[in-house]
Amino acid sequence: MTDNHQMFDLSQWPIDDKRRITGVFTDIDDTLTTDGVIPEQALSALHKLQQAGISVIAITGRPAGWSAPFARDWPLDAIVAENGAVALVGERKYYLQDALTRANNQLRMSKVLATILQVVPNARVSQDSAGRETDIAIDHSEHHFLDAQDIAQVVHIMQENGMTATVSSIHINGWYGEHNKLEGARWITNKLLGRDLDADLNAWVYIGDSTNDQVMFAHFDNSVGVANIKVFEKELQHLPRYITPSERGEGFAEVVDALLLARPIPVPTE
């Protein structure tokens, strides 16, 4: 585990560290996307990584249903949705928990959700909730605003009922299980690539933007926050090691450019 007390400018990322990178983990909302849409420079950056033979896996709190079209259409190896519980690889879907566990957890979560909506009158479920299979989500900044006190109360209710709770840039997510973004990364890296993530950690970089990325910032020596992470800086116990000059999708593209520019230029053979 790393313990970063300050964020260094992306330009200070050592070239030898960048050259070791063979895989990228990234958040989606407000990291790859800007105002809910992936900008051209971020999509182009994904294509560049694919062409360079660098694995790209998105890890998000978004639901499996919301993520499915992007898993098919974007140049990604996989999307791990619902904070590590569901993996989408092209048209295929994999679950971390078995069907019985998921069904039991759905019943428990529905009761917690009813409590939240009763105790916090301003709370609203996220508009993407229909596509959720293993968690619940309360909107705090995407289509509906919750103040800090209401957010804290929602988190408290989830945790009081034995749930894991995280706050992203747009939602409060809660679920039953010990999984998180890091466990999801370990799971899919082994399942899809046959690689032991912890034995190969210096070959990966994580890119994120908010408090629910902290477990990744804490674990990865190579971690980058896009510039809009400054909004959450005071709330972060673990900072990313580096920060981009630009926000959101443009910042993601800057990380990719930094990686690719560090690679040795192939010498033509006669």
Per-region residue spans from a language model:
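Short, structured coil segments at secondary-structure junctions
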Residues: 74-75, 83, 161, 219-220, ...
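Short, well-ordered beta-strand core segments
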Residues: 24, 49, 79, 223-225, ...
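Non-catalytic pre-domain segments flanking phosphatase-related domains
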Residues: 1-26, 270
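Mg2+-dependent phosphoryl-transfer enzymes with acidic/Ser/Thr/Gly-rich catalytic loops
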Residues: 14, 19, 39, 182-270
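Conserved acidic, metal-coordinating active-site core of Asp-based
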Residues: 115, 119-219
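Active-site phosphate-binding/coordination module
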Residues: 35-130
